[in-house]
């Protein structure tokens, strides 16, 4: 057992390992989950489900960050952006990291125990996706697509929690999330591309090569098209489609940031995706208030 004094001194290191000082990953995981809850519940999801999924998102994203740093501990020291991570520098041991990831995953599973059994079953592939994603960068040409599945798995889980099933519309929304994730995480990968080329890991930014900017914009277009299809299928009104238009305008602005492939501006574009997710969520909420489902 870790003594209280020791735990308090190490807590800041654990929080850094969980990336709680950088909440963008939590937000990019949260927005699709909230979209799913609102769509599944026709605009009025139960409060307890919102709380459970919000907490679960924070916990599983944190666990995913710990697992990612464990998997990449031999690479991160060679990348400018990651060389000071606690596991890379040895400030946190491998044993501590694995125990932390296991603890976060366990608490997250306990949260969903009161929910529909299908949610518990879906949590198994969700955990596998979160744990295996870091390793896909070693053999998949576009690991960002795998990330999109992992980051979007709250979508089928949200529908299962509300409806007790996962309808086709949930999988369509998950597909949209995959394209969105490829878009924003390619922007992120453009930041690390010089380092990633040196150490030999695979990313969409490397795979797309000189077509990276075009690929990002195409993925945004497909994602918004699929989200619009979800809106049509669920009978959404002008507020929601107006939100899609605003999100598309943000993506067009991203083009001005990433076209020169400046690392700092690519990172800014990546961070702006929080606003893409937020705009779509707010538009969905307002649309359901203005045009309740029949």
Curated annotation (Swiss-Prot):
Its main location: membrane. InterPro entries: HB_polyprenyltransferase-like (IPR006370), Prenyltransferase (IPR039653), UbiA_prenyltransferase (IPR000537), UbiA_prenylTrfase_CS (IPR030470), UbiA_sf (IPR044878). GO terms for molecular function: 4-hydroxybenzoate polyprenyltransferase activity. Pathway: Cofactor biosynthesis; ubiquinone biosynthesis. It is found in: Cell inner membrane. The chain crosses the membrane at residues 24-44, 47-67, 99-119, 139-159, 164-184, 213-233, 238-258, 274-294. Pfam families: UbiA (PF01040). This is 4-hydroxybenzoate octaprenyltransferase.
């Amino acid at each position: 057992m870790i003594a209280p004094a020791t735990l308090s001194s190490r807590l800041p290191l654990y929080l850094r390992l969980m990336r709680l000082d950088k909440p963008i990953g939590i937000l990019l995981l949260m927005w699709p989950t909230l979209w799913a809850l609102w769509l599944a519940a026709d605009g009025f999801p139960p409060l307890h489900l919102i709380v459970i999924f919000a907490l679960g998102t924070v916990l599983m994203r944190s666990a995913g960050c710990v697992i990612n740093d464990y998997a990449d501990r031999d690479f991160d020291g060679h990348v400018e952006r990651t060389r000071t991570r606690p596991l890379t520098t040895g400030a946190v041991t491998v044993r501590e990291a694995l125990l932390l990831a296991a603890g976060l995953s366990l608490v997250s599973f306990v949260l969903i125990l009161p929910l529909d059994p299908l949610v518990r079953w879906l949590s198994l592939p969700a955990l596998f996706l979160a744990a295996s994603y870091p390793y896909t960068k070693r053999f998949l040409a576009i690991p960002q697509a795998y990330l999109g599945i992992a980051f979007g798995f709250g979508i089928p889980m949200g529908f299962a929690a509300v409806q007790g099933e996962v309808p086709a519309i949930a999988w369509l929304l998950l597909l949209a999330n995959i394209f969105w994730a490829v878009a924003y995480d390619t922007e992120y990968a453009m930041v690390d591309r010089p380092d990633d080329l040196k150490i030999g890991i695979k990313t969409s930014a490397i795979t797309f090569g000189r077509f990276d900017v075009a690929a990002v914009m195409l993925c945004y277009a497909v994602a918004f098209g699929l989200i619009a299809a979800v809106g049509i299928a669920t009978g959404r009104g002008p507020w929601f489609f107006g939100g899609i238009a605003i999100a598309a305008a943000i993506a067009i602005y991203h083009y001005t940031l990433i076209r020169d492939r400046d690392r700092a501006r690519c990172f800014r574009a990546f961070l702006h995706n929080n606003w893409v997710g937020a705009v779509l969520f707010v538009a969905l909420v307002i649309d359901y208030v203005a045009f309740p489902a029949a």
